[in-house]
Amino acid sequence: MRYLIVLFTSLFFSINVIAAGSDSSSGGDSSKKSLYADAVKLVKRAGKLEKKDKTEKAKKLYAQAFKKLEKAYKSDKKNPDVLNYMGFTTRKVGNFDQAEKFYLEGLKIKPNHNGI
């Protein structure tokens, strides 16, 4: 389990570095990135709560993150990072079958995705 936490934590930081290096002049892209970035922040906060055995509070944050990711997905259905986090947050709240679907959909887009 710790291995997965380390793996996903590493993924979170690498995604932020990649996102920080890109620039967009489109308002739609900025809104989409904002939803995604907000969701990532919620996931990180939830992870910290889990480490403190505050599982129920963490699940609420994962659910909030998922809602933001859903909105980001609606505007960009070809983003494997969004699908990865959708799978991750769904798995964290206990919906393993749905999580698998998101992971598999992300792998269809990018078969060698590091986080999936």
Segment roles from a protein language model:
Residues 33, 81, 114-115:
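Start-of-helix register in tetratricopeptide repeats
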